[in-house]
Structures are given as C-alpha cells and as structure tokens.
C-alpha cells in the first residue's frame, strides 16, 4: 500500500499549501481517518444510460465503494464510498444564463477531480461559475464524512463532516463541521462549525449559527478521532442493511414501483413502504415504513422512517425524516435531521421550507404550520417560535432583521422567491411533473441504468490503486 501512502501525503501537502494563510494543518484530522485496508475491500461502480454522455477516466487513484454517472475524470485522488453523480451536468450547445450574459457551451461539462480525498461525499449538480462552465473541478480538496459538494467547484479546501457547499465556487477555505454555504463565490475563509449562510450579494444575506455545545451532541470532530455523535450513530445503526444491497448482484425491488417512478438499485427499502407515481429514490437512500406521495423524492444518503410525505415533497441530500407527517410541497433541505417519536410525531404543514441543516428533535408532539420557514435547532414549541416565521411575513423584510441566533439583511421577498424558484426547479429536474408524455426528469430517465464494477490491484506496491481506466462509448 506504499502508493496509497504516497498519494495521501501528496494530497495533504497540497491542501495545506492552499490553506497556509489560515495557518491550518489538515494532517492530524486526516491521517488514519480511513484505514487503508478498508480502501482495498470495495469495488467501484459506474452507470450507463442512453440519456447521459459517457466519458470516465481514472488515473492513479483509489475509488473504493464509489459510484460514477456521466462524464468524470479522477486523477491522483482517493475516493471512499463517494457518489459522483453527473446526471445534471450541462451539455454541448446548452446556454447558461448569468446576469445579463447568455453563455453557450462548446462541449459537454465534466466533473474533474484531482489531488483530492473525498470520504462518503456526494458530488452533484453542475458548475454555476461562469468562468468554468465546462469543468466542474474539485482540486486539492479534502472532504470528510457525509459532506455535499453541490454545484460547487472547489480548490484548496477542507470540508468537515456533514458540511455542504451549495452553488458556490470555493477556494482556499475551511468549511466547518455541519456548516452550510450558499454564497456564490468565497475564498480564504474559515467558516465556523454549525454556520448556515445563504447569500446573494447586494440582494440578501441569511446567517445562523448553531449553539456549539448543543450541536456537539449531534456531531463533533476532533484530531485523531473519527466523527462522533447522534448523526454518526444513526447512520452506523443502519449500515448492515446497505451491505446486502451492495453484496448481491441481482436484487429485485421489494415494493411495487409505478412505471413513472425510479427506485435506485442501491437504495434500501424496508417493509411497509409505498412509492407513488413520479417518485425518485436515489442511491444510498433508506426507506422504512415510508409513504411517498406523487412527485416526492428521497435523494442520496436520505432516510425516511415511519413517515408520510403527501406529494411533491423534497428530501434533499443527507436529510433524515423520522416519525413525521409532511403535507404537500414541503422542502426539507440538505442534511436536515427531523426526528419525532412514535407517541410524539412531528407534523409539517404544506408548502413549508425547512432550511438546510435544520435540526428538529422532539419528545412531545409538534406541529409546524403551513407556509412556514424553519431553521436552527428546535426541541419544543418555544424553540419553534424563535426559529421560524410565516413565509409571507419573511417576504416583508426589507432591511436588517434578527430572531434568535438568525440574522437577515436585505430583501426577504427576493429570498423567498429564490427559494421557491429553486424548489420548483428541483421538482422539474426530478420528474415530479411528468404527465405521461412530457416533463420527464430523473424519476423517468434513471429507470434503466446498467451498472458495471471495477476493482483495484489486490496486492503489491500498487495495492489499493485502480489501474488507469478510460471508459467511452
């Protein structure tokens, strides 16, 4: 495994060079975070469909347990159980609109991963940077457990566990544990753990910071240790269910799936689960006694347990919904943790927006009214009051406003409009509005994927490295 050692040292050095202005050394956090014997045990796999351009290139890298779809190149990198999902990449002749510009693409977009270490990380969407529309790059970057790199080119960064960088070009930055950044473009920043930051320059700025002592019950990460807390325990308790999914070659769906819906081969479906028309269930999703109404979706690393989603509900990447009832058109953002109890269920009214990285963890029944914006850390009615607002009231904000640990500046109307527009786009992209003839999306186009596996050198100096592989039509 000497080559894996050299490769990790190379990646650590390159990231440290990029972070030198922040005086940050990633080595104590990363060394031995994933034992190398784990990185030799798992195959990688890729999907082929008639809808997505195929061009995969792997050089001098480990890809253990990782999944690839669409155009992607990986060079001098370590990818452990990560999902590189290129089904939303822009294609040749597409036009990208940015401010007053309409920019045509000369070639298909490609995800380009170089000198990076991604651990159980999701890479999805497409580059929103007008300077690099055809290259969704991830370079000199280390991303730890259950982070999301969503439409966010990254160079010289460290992403803590359960962090999300969303629609943001990020350079030479630290994204702290459980932080969420959607800010357009950032560089040379140390973003503290538990920060939720949504910004459109000159339009609005939403900022919330979790109380770190309480957040540490859910997730904390220190040098020399693996991530720990309720989030990790929750996932680890259900890990065995995924082992069967990945060990069996041919696995028939255990539930009825309508012809307009898509159930990924690598999702876990437990008994008493119902899937309606136009539903999308992505790889590594986990459903148990879950009722998904028409147009609902469960994205990567999401968990829906003993819960009912009435329809057109979005469960974003990494979100967890337990013992809850959601009305129609509810958005649950990245890495949310919504947990009711069997005798104390959580109810969320229709058309509500649960901000990314929101924690609702209750021991008494709690009802969130329809049309509300919710954020922060909520354990009871009192905390719901200080961490939520009706969307119609939030839209009236036109200056600085604060409530609890949340501070907002700018136009509330623009904020609400932007969120609603994005929710509409997600539903469209996922095929929620398919009518039998038009408006196809992932739920319809991801139904027929053929999967192929690739494996690393089994022993010798190159043990754990995958050979150079180029896969083209």
Question: Residue spans of the language-model regions?
Answer:
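Extended low-complexity, polyampholyte segments enriched in Ser/Thr/Pro and acidic residues
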Residues: 1-10, 14-17, 27-50
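Glycine-rich hexapeptide-repeat left-handed beta-helix
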Residues: 11-28, 83-138, 145, 149-154, ...
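Extracellular beta-rich repeat passengers
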Residues: 40-42, 46-64, 68-69, 73-78, ...
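Eukaryote-specific, low-hydrophobicity, charge-rich regions
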Residues: 44, 52-58, 237, 241-263, ...
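Short, conserved secondary-structure segments in the cores of folded domains
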Residues: 70, 109, 251-253, 265, ...
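Beta-propeller domains
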Residues: 258-289, 293-295, 299-300
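Transmembrane alpha-helical segments and their membrane-interface loop/helix boundaries
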Residues: 464, 472-473
């Amino acid at each position: 495994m000497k080559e894996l050692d050299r490769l990790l040292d190379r990646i650590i050095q390159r990231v440290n060079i990029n972070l030198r202005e922040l005086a940050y050394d990633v080595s104590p956090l990363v060394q031995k975070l994933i034992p190398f014997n784990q990185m030799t045990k798992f195959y990688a796999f890729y999907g082929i469909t008639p809808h997505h351009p195929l061009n995969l290139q792997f050089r001098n890298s480990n890809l253990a347990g990782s999944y690839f779809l669409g155009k992607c190149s990986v060079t001098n990198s370590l990818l452990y159980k990560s999902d590189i999902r290129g089904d939303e990449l822009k294609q040749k002749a597409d036009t990208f609109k940015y401010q007053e510009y309409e920019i045509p693409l000369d070639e298909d977009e490609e995800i380009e991963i170089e000198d990076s270490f991604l651990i159980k990380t999701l890479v999805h969407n497409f580059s929103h940077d007008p300077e690099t529309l055809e290259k969704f790059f991830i370079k000199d970057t280390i991303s730890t457990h259950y982070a999301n790199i969503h439409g966010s080119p990254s160079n010289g960064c460290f992403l803590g566990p359960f962090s999300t960088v969303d629609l943001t070009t990020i350079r030479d930055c630290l994204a702290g544990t459980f932080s969420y950044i959607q800010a357009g473009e950032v560089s040379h920043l140390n973003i503290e753990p538990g920060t939720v930051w949504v910004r459109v320059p000159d339009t609005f700025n939403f900022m919330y910071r979790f109380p770190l002592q309480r957040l540490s019950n859910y997730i904390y990460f220190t040098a020399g240790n693996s991530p720990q807390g309720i989030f990790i325990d929750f996932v680890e308790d259900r890990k065995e269910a995924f082992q069967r999914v990945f060990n069996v070659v041919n696995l028939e769906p255990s539930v009825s799936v309508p012809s307009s819906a898509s159930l990924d081969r690598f999702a876990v479906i437990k008994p008493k689960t119902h899937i309606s028309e136009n539903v999308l269930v992505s790889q590594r999703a986990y459903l148990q006694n879950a009722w998904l109404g028409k147009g609902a979706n469960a994205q990567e690393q999401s968990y829906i347990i003993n819960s009912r989603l009435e329809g057109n509900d979005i469960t974003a990447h990494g979100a967890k919904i337990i013992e809850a009832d959601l009305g129609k058109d509810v958005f649950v953002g990245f890495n949310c943790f919504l947990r009711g109890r069997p005798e104390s269920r959580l109810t969320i009214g229709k058309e509500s927006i649960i901000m990314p990285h929101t924690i609702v963890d209750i021991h008494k029944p709690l009802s969130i009214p329809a049309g509300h914006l919710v954020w922060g850390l909520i354990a009871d009615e009192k905390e719901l009051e200080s961490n939520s607002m009706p969307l119609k009231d939030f839209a009236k904000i036109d200056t600085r406003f604060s409530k609890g640990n949340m501070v907002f500046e700018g136009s509330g109307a623009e904020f609400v409009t932007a969120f609603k527009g994005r929710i509409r786009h997600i539903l469209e992209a996922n095929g929620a509005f398919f009518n039998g003839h038009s408006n196809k999306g992932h739920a319809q186009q991801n139904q027929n994927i053929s999967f192929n596996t690739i494996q690393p050198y089994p022993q010798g100096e190159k043990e754990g490295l995958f050979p150079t592989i180029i896969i083209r039509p």
